[in-house]
């Protein structure tokens, strides 16, 4: 799982570099492992409501913070872990047997607006 910070949208250059490296690794491993029938893809989630926010925010403030970010997403809501998991399950299925080396933006349309 990558992050959209790979495109330099993070205030942390180290974090952005690590995520960009993950994107490059995904593409290169896809090429290297294709002959063995192994597919390699990545998901790049937008803002997703997960327990990680409890590490740096008061629990009481998290719901309001997430709500304030709904309008940032073209689909009008912050993502859930289930949203990301469903995309991963799809990528693991035979329905995507011809997909490899792809970075999937799972972000309610944020990257579609920014490109």
Regions found by a protein language model. Name each.
Residues 73-84:
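A conserved structural motif in NAD(P)-dependent oxidoreductases
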Residues 45-55:
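Short, flexible catalytic-loop segment of classical short-chain dehydrogenase/reductase
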Residues 84-85, 91:
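Non-catalytic, hydrophobic alpha-helical segments
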Residues 58-73:
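A short C-terminal helix-loop "cap" of Rossmann-like NAD(P)-dependent dehydrogenase/epimerase domains
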Residues 89, 100-115:
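Short C-terminal tail/terminal secondary-structure segment
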Residues 34, 39, 99-101:
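Short, small/polar-rich loop/turn modules that mediate ligand/substrate recognition or access, typified
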Residues 1-7, 72-75, 109:
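Active-site pre-Tyr helix/loop in NAD(P)-dependent dehydrogenases
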Residues 1-21, 26-27, 31-35, 47-48:
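Catalytic loop of short-chain dehydrogenase/reductase
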């Amino acid at each position: 799982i990558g992050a959209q910070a790979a495109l330099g949208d993070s205030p942390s250059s180290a974090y952005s570099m690590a995520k960009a490296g993950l994107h490059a690794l995904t593409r290169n491993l896809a090429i290297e492992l294709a002959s063995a029938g192994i597919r390699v893809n990545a998901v790049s989630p937008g803002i997703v409501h997960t327990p990680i926010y409890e590490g740096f925010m008061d629990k009481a403030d998290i719901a309001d913070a997430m709500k304030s970010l709904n309008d940032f997403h073209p689909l009008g809501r912050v993502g859930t872990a289930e949203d990301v998991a469903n995309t991963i399950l799809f990528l693991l299925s035979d329905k995507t047997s011809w997909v490899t080396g792809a970075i999937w933006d799972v972000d309610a349309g944020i990257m579609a607006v920014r490109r």
